[in-house]
């Protein structure tokens, strides 16, 4: 149980692929102009990570070490192709919006990295959980960044959600404030870099605060004569 909890915490926070490892920067910065686009690509990446980790882990005993990377890439490409066709069939608006960034999931360092670092060494169930956790961690970061940029740039939230979730999702669109022209700095790549930098700073502050609280808790449990050694 502790190993399962550790996998989840690592994927969502401690080893977050977007905020700690800083992997997948190209789609993170390019696609997160709206919350809907960010959520769509994040969920697609999560599905790819989960399925590829599961498949690679299940086949790890029969995968020759010398050619494992080409095999991993072939498996990842197959899963990405299937996910791309699913998005094309059921969320065509999102498919058009994301464009080339869906097939580019094949080259995403997050996917190949988890296959090599985790799925090739652990069982299928734990590997699938790792892929899901890493994917949801990246999705969360992309969604927060996309929401920030959409609100500041357009004054809306969940604009175009019907392209991802269907016609019913039109009710999710919220106009926070009206603007006749978008704030381009937030919508263009420089705004993505600024937003990501702010998110990294906030995560650092939270981590430092949590670390300080843990140190204070340990110091409180020790005898008074030993606190100076903590």
From Swiss-Prot:
The chain crosses the membrane at residues 18-38, 39-59, 63-83, 86-106, 125-145, 182-202. The keyword Iron does not apply. The complex is composed of six subunits: RnfA, RnfB, RnfC, RnfD, RnfE and RnfG. This is Ion-translocating oxidoreductase complex subunit E. Keywords: Cell inner membrane, Cell membrane, Electron transport, Membrane, Translocase, Transmembrane, Transmembrane helix, Transport. Belongs to the NqrDE/RnfAE family. It is a multi-pass membrane protein. It holds the Pfam family Rnf-Nqr. InterPro entries: NqrDE/RnfAE, RnfE. It is found in: Cell inner membrane. One of its GO terms (biological process) is electron transport chain. The lineage of its organism: Bacteria, Pseudomonadati, Pseudomonadota, Gammaproteobacteria, Enterobacterales. Its EC number is 7.-.-.-. Part of a membrane-bound complex that couples electron transfer with translocation of ions across the membrane. Its main location: membrane. The gene is rnfE. GO terms for cellular component: plasma membrane. It is an enzyme of class 7 (translocase).
